[in-house]
């Protein structure tokens, strides 16, 4: 909603489709008001689709490969398309992490890498919070000047 990164994980010999449900369950435990989530095609599996539908009110999980008529209808629905457009913000956050130093880890070992990733996510969230506070203050100033 506000662009914060709510969950991160360093994956070791794991694929996206094996982690989707676990990742959402952990996030839902921390953020009980989470109602929906958007994923890449790599996260799709029939099991993920059904299990995630039980956890969340709305799941955007595009199917891999050729779509059936029913799946095509679902993926062309207005809500699905709108959510997919918003998914670019997720990709943008990942890109921002890379642009602000996560593309090259200066720590050594797995523990150092995990720490580096966690601190990068924290720094990005602080940056987003700062931007939101600046925007709020800017709106206040514009209202004062208009009055």
Region locations from a protein language model:
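Anion-binding and metal-coordination hotspots
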Residues: 1-147
